[in-house]
Amino acid sequence: SLKAVLPTIMNHSAFIKNKYAQPMGYGTHLRSEIVWQKNKNNGKAVDPYKLLPPLFEGIDISSDTYLDGKGQIRDGAAAMMAYMLLQFSDLDSDIRKRIVKGLLKYCELDTLAMVLLYEHWKFLSESKYPC
């Protein structure tokens, strides 16, 4: 799984750190986001999926019908559940908008994760001393 290797890439690639430790300035739903952030406790890169904001801040989602019960879309299973909710549930328009926004951010981050992996490999392949 890409999500399993992404933290390692982010922790060991100075190229990735330098490029993504500032607002990206491109993209659609992550344009102003900083993908590479340092954990204040251990100095390692924070998993960018954990930086995705909660969808239902200020809304009671105690029922287990919404995603993981916490209102997060941080993995493929939650994304599939969210998409299913959009297709087959009678949702309040505010909740529907929040789910769509969350799915768009999650999907863009998933695509960006593939780009990070590619950029890391490309940097290593072009580097005289990759290790």
Q: What are the functions of these language-model segments?
A:
Residues 1-131:
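DEDD superfamily 3′-5′ metal-dependent exonuclease/proofreading module
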